[in-house]
């Protein structure tokens, strides 16, 4: 069984190799966890994001991820994952699966052993938490990610409970 733990708390306090950010396609900060990570990381993170090549302002398409330095965070990297806006995609599940998979693939490719993850797309992007938790657990349980210590940081007791239920189902 893969090493997955659940924490109710602030992802910006995680001491890990990589922190996954629930980013937007521009990668320039925003609300929720994205804004919190950018504020905690300081100017080095926004500068690293500006250095990522863009096409018409898009640095990371939906369902994909990019890796940058972590600035002032207690991590080596920030992995910016762009999940789906739930009601804007015909198949949001596939996009969310891809965002988690690309994040974990980048973690492995950059020799990370520990990763902190948020509930991608569950804030302003409107993904139902129960469905998102099922998708996240299904991806994280894949054998190719067995070497990673994955820690989900969840912002409320309700979210923690939803993720605990999903974890026990897998």
Swiss-Prot record:
Domain Macro span(s) in chain numbering: 1-170
SUPFAM superfamilies: Macro domain-like
A Pfam family of this chain: Macro
Domain of life of the organism encoding this protein: Bacteria
Listed SMART domains: A1pp
Family membership: Belongs to the MacroD-type family.
Record InterPro entries: Macro_dom (IPR002589), Macro_dom-like (IPR043472)
Species whose genome carries this gene: Vibrio parahaemolyticus serotype O3:K6 (strain RIMD 2210633)
Full protein name: Macro domain-containing protein VPA0103
